[in-house]
Design a protein with these regions (language model features):
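Alpha-helical transmembrane segments and their immediate juxtamembrane cytosolic regions
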Residues: 1-278
Length: 278
């Protein structure tokens, strides 16, 4: 039976992701990728940027967790090969072919500033097109990560062919479930703390493969269990309260800083809102 709450939670989260990017595009807190704010901080505080501090720590981990839950339910119905074939068709194909057919338009807007500075002067049109296509990768990193995790999941499932680990996770009490948040804290430390300019460090920090693999596997092995969902459903109000308090504390103590920096993401408060926010 399809669980519509997963679909509802997913589309609401996607809308919040879009809302976040509207705010982020005009932020003045030093977050890379936007076009800049209405003036320098702190002369122009731009309090609407609070949205970035509240939403960024948890919405992408939540989407990966939901993807892990959905993968569990799908693999209960289909064999691994059929499921992965469908994943490849729905994820990898749009992330490659779609990059050159549609996302060059996103790349065009990403390169407007560079064009105004004369960076593309003398460069042939087909080369510009290639640059725009690659720079337009944008949200495709999510489905590229998801495809990779789907491949890894098939390998991991062979280690737990009889679902013993999955069944053990379903017996976890509330305290162990909350302590799983420590894994997020450890996952954030896999980021490159001081990314080097003109290297792949920034790209790695964007994809965060190790960090995002954690909620994906949590969704598959832990949160897909009906027993776990029932336990958390009974205490959702206190958990939501903890998330709200953590979010307020994080915003008050870090407002004005780059909320996407590895140092900020690895802070205990960030990890708390990351876990409780889901």
């Amino acid at each position: 039976m399809r669980k519509h709450w997963i679909d509802n939670l997913r589309w609401v989260t996607v809308l919040l992701v879009l809302f976040y990017h509207v705010i982020y595009f005009y932020n003045n807190k030093g977050v890379f990728g936007g076009i800049g704010g209405f003036g320098p901080y702190p002369e122009y505080p731009q309090y609407q940027d609070v949205v970035m501090y509240i939403l960024y720590p948890w919405f992408m981990p939540l989407l990966f967790l939901l993807a892990g839950i959905s993968a569990r339910y799908a693999l209960d119905k289909y064999d691994g090969k059929s499921w992965f074939r469908a994943r490849t068709r729905k994820l990898l194909v749009p992330a490659t072919i779609g990059l050159f057919v549609f996302h060059w338009m996103v790349g065009y807007f990403n390169t407007v500033v560079a064009s105004r500075q004369g960076v593309f002067e003398g460069i042939p049109g087909f080369v510009k097109y290639g640059i725009m296509a690659v720079s337009g990768i944008g949200p495709l990193w999510f489905i590229q990560d998801l495809w990779l995790f789907s491949l890894l999941l098939l390998l991991i499932r062979k280690l737990d062919a009889k679902d013993r680990f999955y069944q053990a996770c379903g017996k976890l009490g509330l305290a162990p479930l909350i302590l799983l948040g420590i894994l997020f804290f450890l996952g954030e430390y896999t980021l490159v703390r001081q990314p080097r300019p003109e290297s792949l460090d920034g790209l790695y920090n964007l994809y965060k493969p190790v960090f995002y693999l954690i909620p994906f596997l949590m969704g598959y092995f832990v949160f897909a269990n009906d027993a776990v969902q029932e336990k958390l459903g009974k205490v959702w109000i206190p958990l939501l309260g903890c998330a709200a308090v953590s979010g307020i504390a994080l915003t008050v103590t870090t407002f004005g800083q780059d909320n996407t920096s590895p140092q900020n993401l690895a802070s205990p408060l960030n990890c708390l809102i990351n876990f409780f926010g889901r």
